[in-house]
């Protein structure tokens, strides 16, 4: 891998991780195109580069993670965030690890993963249309309204993102939007989970491929991905804070559909 390829991979990871398109799939595609990597190695490389997203989330949401630490000491708000992380992680681990093993063994799963993203995207757009027509207060939930059931659903949704073609941020943000959360709260609640899911993905990739993914060039791509991620997070959260709730839902849904269709076309 040369320096230019590392830059391309870093930019792809830094942008696609936070959008409703699968960063793993985009990195896989670029890796196979520029490096002629095998599907298995490209898949593991896509997972390993999520370490860049982990660092970006830890930096950008450092105050939230400090609250989580205070949750161990009894802080009420921190305890809510701590519970959220524990419940979603447990649900993700219970379902995600077996799915990862299956994906590695039967790589790739074809167009089915893409169809799931298309269906979710259509659901979000349909939900946005209903909210606009009803002019109700739905879609205004904040993190304080999060229930254990909602946490578990987010964790289960996140587990599906180990499959090629399914975006972690896309499927978790979509789930939260469908549950009626404000767009900025949905994005934030999704992004805060990146370190847990990302560390797990990076560890699985390293244990699977070892030195093949932990090269100096890949580390360079990771650092570039970190910088691009910080810029992307800020831009997305500013957009989500706008009063155009319906527009945010439609944009997220459209990107999810586009990502799903891309996956279907690549599988055909």
Swiss-Prot record:
InterPro entries: UppP
Record has Transmembrane helix as a keyword: yes
Cross-referenced Pfam families: BacA (PF02673)
Gene Ontology MF term list: undecaprenyl-diphosphatase activity
Catalysed transformations (reactions): di-trans,octa-cis-undecaprenyl diphosphate + H2O = di-trans,octa-cis-undecaprenyl phosphate + phosphate + H(+)
Compartments where located: Cell membrane
Keywords, sorted A to Z: Cell membrane, Hydrolase, Membrane, Transmembrane, Transmembrane helix
Family indicated by similarity: Belongs to the UppP family.
Stated name of the protein: Undecaprenyl-diphosphatase
Organism: Pyrobaculum islandicum (strain DSM 4184 / JCM 9189 / GEO3)
């Amino acid at each position: 891998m040369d320096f230019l390829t590392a830059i391309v991979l870093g930019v792809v990871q830094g942008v696609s991780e936070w959008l409703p398109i699968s960063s793993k799939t985009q990195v896989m595609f670029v890796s196979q195109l520029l490096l002629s990597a095998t599907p298995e190695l490209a898949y593991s490389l896509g997972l390993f580069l999520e370490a860049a997203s982990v660092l970006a989330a830890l930096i950008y949401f450092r105050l939230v993670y400090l609250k989580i630490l205070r949750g161990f000491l009894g802080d009420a708000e921190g305890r809510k965030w701590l519970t959220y992380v524990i419940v979603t992680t447990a649900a993700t681990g219970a379902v995600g690890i077996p799915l990862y093993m299956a994906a590695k063994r039967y790589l790739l799963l074809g167009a089915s993963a893409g169809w799931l993203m298309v269906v979710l995207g259509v659901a979000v757009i349909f939900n946005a249309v209903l909210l606009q027509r009803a002019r109700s207060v739905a879609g205004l939930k904040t993190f304080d309204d999060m229930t254990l059931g909602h946490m578990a659903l987010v964790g289960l949704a996140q587990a599906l993102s180990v499959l090629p073609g399914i975006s972690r941020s896309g499927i978790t943000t979509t789930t939260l939007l469908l549950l009626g959360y404000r767009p900025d709260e949905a994005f934030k609640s999704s992004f805060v989970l990146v370190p847990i899911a990302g560390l797990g993905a990076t560890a699985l990739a390293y244990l699977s491929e070892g030195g093949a993914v932990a090269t100096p060039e890949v580390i360079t791509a990771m650092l570039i991905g970190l910088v691009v991620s910080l810029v992307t997070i800020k831009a997305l959260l500013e957009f989500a804070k706008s009063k155009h709730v319906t527009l945010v839902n439609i944009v997220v849904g459209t990107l999810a559909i586009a990502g799903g269709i891309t996956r279907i076309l690549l599988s055909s």
